[in-house]
Amino acid sequence: MTFSVEQVRADFPVLNREVNGQPLVYLDSAASAQKPEAVIGAEAEFYRHGYAAVHRGIHTLSAEATARMEAVRQQAATFLNAGSAEEVVFVRGTTEGINLVANSWGNANVGAGDNIIISEMEHHANIVPWQMLCARVGAELRVIPLNPDGTLQLDVVPGLFDPRTRLLAITEVSNVLGTENPLAALIALAHQHGAKVLVDGAQAVMHHPVDVQALGCDFYVFSAHKLYGPTGIGVLYARSELLQTMAPWEGGGSMIATVSLTEGTTWNQAPWRFEAGTPNTGGIIGLGAALTYVSQLGLTQIAEYEQTLMRYALDALRAVPDLILYGPAQRKGVIAFNLGQHHAYDVGSFLDNYGIAVRTGHHCAMPLMARYQVPAMCRASLAMYNTTEEVDRLVAGLQRIRKLLG
């Protein structure tokens, strides 16, 4: 189908509101995307007419809710082209998915003297769990450095691997720079050395199709709320042969097969043994609606529109005097910048006065801020509902701020 940004915008109620007397320009989707009516309505309908506890009842509502939840598991598997629905674990989000792998697979497979490789551009969620694991077991955390343009120093990467490398944990798309990493080559290199690969897909799944089998990764994680879905729900994909060997890291209801005070506890099958307690079923229903929504629009069509918009935005922003852009020319989703020597918080506050929402701060990427020797950056993120007119308003706002602040 032909992509129409006007039709897409009509599906998002919040885009009709004003902020500080100005029409809202929402350029913070990389932090959390807005929700279409289809997602809002699906979750509301579930709570109005179909809510019940799943996997716990023989009555009709429970059976229906369970079937709907498991249908979304299959939908997520199809979305990622996983081998089966049983390779999909529902988690609270990308952060929990990474922590699950670190505390389950990591505790069993990483030991003293081993090493894990990450990159300098990672979000804290793909740094801190590995730091914690390395501290627990006496392993080493190795870091792929960046070039000045925000791409990986690929010539350094082979030298970081050795026979004790257990994992490469790498983002697909940087949440600050928009850098799209060459996953196929990195995954192949890691596997040559016997290491597993976890991909942080939080900033990727909304921008292009993802095929985990084609990538060959061992783990892949993403959050629904960046994919136009609800907060509090995400997906961990794990290859079946790995997931079947992993122990649960949280205990409680649903994740057990049997519990005995004298003989101990046995675990449920994967993936359910990783889903302790009552799940966020409403969020799962909303995730399913979000997957349906973007799939019907077509991620290839979305990618084409967004890349055209990105080129327009970069060209327009390069014309703003004193504007410092960070990241490579070819990027996805985000544009990080500073305006001269003015603090990012000041610039972001002025933009908010003009009805323009951008993110300011370290973006949960403090090592990356240190790499560029700045305390903070502004970040404008472009989603499928943004327009060239909104880019023009951002540019005009920055021009105005420059005149006001000097």
From Swiss-Prot:
Annotated active site: 364
InterPro entries the UniProt entry points to: Aminotrans_V_dom (IPR000192), Aminotrans_V_PyrdxlP_BS (IPR020578), Cys_dSase_SufS (IPR010970), PyrdxlP-dep_Trfase (IPR015424), PyrdxlP-dep_Trfase_major (IPR015421), PyrdxlP-dep_Trfase_small (IPR015422)
CDD domains listed in its UniProt record: SufS_like
Record's keyword terms, sorted: Cytoplasm, Lyase, Pyridoxal phosphate, Transferase
Source domain of life: Bacteria
Keyword rRNA-binding: no
Record-listed N6-(pyridoxal phosphate)lysine modification sites: 226
Presence of the UniProt keyword Lyase in the record: yes
Function: Cysteine desulfurases mobilize the sulfur from L-cysteine to yield L-alanine, an essential step in sulfur metabolism for biosynthesis of a variety of sulfur-containing biomolecules. Component of the suf operon, which is activated and required under specific conditions such as oxidative stress and iron limitation. Acts as a potent selenocysteine lyase in vitro, that mobilizes selenium from L-selenocysteine. Selenocysteine lyase activity is however unsure in vivo.
Quaternary structure, from the entry: Homodimer. Interacts with SufE and the SufBCD complex composed of SufB, SufC and SufD. The interaction with SufE is required to mediate the direct transfer of the sulfur atom from the S-sulfanylcysteine.
Name of the protein described by the UniProt record: Cysteine desulfurase
Organism: Klebsiella pneumoniae subsp. pneumoniae (strain ATCC 700721 / MGH 78578)
Gene designation per UniProt: sufS
